[in-house]
A protein has these predicted regions:
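Short, solvent-exposed amphipathic alpha-helical segments in soluble enzyme
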Residues: 83-91, 147-153
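Flexible, glycine/proline-enriched loop segments at strand-loop-helix junctions
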Residues: 2-6, 49, 107, 129-135
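Glycine-rich phosphate-binding loops that contact phosphosugars or nucleotide phosphates
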Residues: 112, 117, 121-128, 134-153
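Short glycine-rich anion-binding loops that position phosphate/pyrophosphate groups of nucleotides
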Residues: 45, 77-79, 137-140
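Long, charge-dense
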Residues: 87-130
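Short, well-ordered, mixed-charge alpha-helical segments that flank or form enzyme active sites
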Residues: 81-82, 104-106, 141-144
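Electropositive, gly/pro-rich neighborhoods at or near active sites that engage anionic ligands
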Residues: 2-73, 81
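General beta-strand structural signal in soluble alpha/beta enzymes
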Residues: 72-74, 97, 134-135
């Protein structure tokens, strides 16, 4: 069950309660369940549960990374704006967007977001833990991330 924080707005708390009720029982562990509830809350799509797959322990590792100071890196300013208030009031996590690293003009065959993601990943992954990526609506950022992971980044 998701822990309700003192700062959670009553409308948010009620929304999560209704989402949980509509979803019914799942086989997800508590952290995975919270991810699902947040995704449904953000998208309004109750069918997302059937599409989610988690690597065992991924949520625990992500939470530990956040507790260790990992940055949340988003593909869009809109995604950053959506998660920044909760990130700030829970663990004080810094939220940044790949657009901070994006060139003014994308090279031919690429996008500003894809170039920005690669630059941000390389910059933020240095001596610290890699950033946690939140991809909202830029498919080229996701494609570049998958390329980086495949290359061993």
């Amino acid at each position: 069950m998701m822990a309700v924080m003192a700062q959670d707005h009553p409308i948010f708390t009620e929304s999560i309660r209704r989402i949980r009720e509509a979803l019914g029982p799942t086989a997800l562990d508590p952290l995975e369940q919270q991810v699902l509830e947040r995704l449904v809350h953000s998208s309004g799509d109750l069918t997302l549960g059937g599409l989610l797959q988690f690597t065992p322990g991924a949520c625990d590792r992500g939470l530990e990374a956040l507790r260790s100071g990992a940055v949340i890196l988003t593909d869009t300013a809109m995604a950053a704006a959506a998660v920044a208030p909760m990130a700030k009031r829970t663990l004080g996590t810094q939220v940044r967007t790949v657009l901070e690293w994006a060139p003014d003009c994308a090279p031919q065959g690429s996008t500003r977001t894809a170039v920005g993601l690669e630059r941000a990943w390389n910059d933020l992954s240095g001596d610290r833990s890699s950033p946690l990526l939140l991809i909202g609506s830029a498919p080229t950022a996701l494609e570049r991330l998958l390329d980086l992971v495949a290359a061993g980044a």
